[in-house]
Amino acid sequence: MSANQSPAGQPPTATYDSAFLKACRREPVPHTPVWFMRQAGRSLPEYLKVREGIPMLESCMRPELVAEITLQPVRRHGVDAAVYFSDIVVPLKAIGIDLDIKPGVGPVIAEPIRTRADLARLRDLTPEDVAYVTEAFGLLTRELGATPLIGFAGAPFTLASYLVEGGPSRNHEHTKALMYGDPQLWADLLDRLAGITAAFLKVQIEAGASAVQLFDSWVGALSPADYRRSVLPASRKVFEAVSGYGVPRIHFGVGTGELLGLLGEAGADVVGVDWRVPLDEAARRVGPGKALQGNLDPAVLFAGREAVETKTREVLDAATGLEGHVFNLGHGVLPTTDPDALTRLVEYVHTQTTR
């Protein structure tokens, strides 16, 4: 089923006619919808208050806290969609991988996965493993009403990079050594991770997600040839696994200007674009039949109001001929961003694009 169809035999949900979902389906919209990656996070004082003293992973497993954090930017900024508060390594933790999220570092894996014997530690994910996700989605969908809720997961390549490297990496040397040195083990690893990721997304969709985004944070480290050969099959498996639900599927990675066409080819309905490629050029690279999401440089929000509006206007102008456009930043909200600048940005985009 394509993103242009409501689920078979079911009436459209309360969110179906929202500007966000219409844009994802490449339908006419009353205004360009806006949401921000990492909109629920450290840029908000109310987030810092409720998270105080609570480790990141623990906060992702408390349904009422997750719901409150997810709702905060919707209340404050008036964004067109909420995005579920979690972390891409949550499903790995849920299946028993010994990991922690260290402040200022990111996910750290106690025992990296680098051999075939290590693969046995990656068991299947079940809904029972992440019951707190289902509970949080229930709380959120009741509270959000007609506002769409975006679910998300980490893409197989990025999860593999964390598992193989043992944490964040600048050069991904262990990851690439495995990918080039033992292609079969690499393929089996990504296939296993694709199954885990698909299961995690299915839990979110069945609990009420209106759309899902697959984050491939590190895949910009690869050439197009390496992506096509070593990553595309696993990402495609994820998208195919959730294709029957009728919810839009978004794909985003940082530094993926040379991979945009392949991100769409993997099965996305919407391709996220970082700030390095103008949206009109991105549309040429992606090809027809896809909506685009993006792509204001997050650092622009540290400039004055006039500069922000000028750069935003450039993004909107580049999006004029797109089949569908969801306004977003070209990456996540930076932690020290002034939240008032985000609120003004939402208002500006809405005002400038009202049909």
Swiss-Prot record:
Subunit and partners: Homodimer.
GO MF, any single term: uroporphyrinogen decarboxylase activity
Subcellular location: Cytoplasm
Main subcellular localisation: cytoplasm
Family per similarity comment: Belongs to the uroporphyrinogen decarboxylase family.
Pathway it works in: Porphyrin-containing compound metabolism; protoporphyrin-IX biosynthesis; coproporphyrinogen-III from 5-aminolevulinate: step 4/4
Descriptive protein name: Uroporphyrinogen decarboxylase
Keyword Lyase tagged: yes
Example GO biological process: heme biosynthetic process
General function of this protein: Catalyzes the decarboxylation of four acetate groups of uroporphyrinogen-III to yield coproporphyrinogen-III.
Broad enzyme group: lyase
Residues reported in the UniProt entry to bind substrate: R38, Q39, A40, G41, R42, D87, Y162, S217, H331
Keyword match Chaperone: no
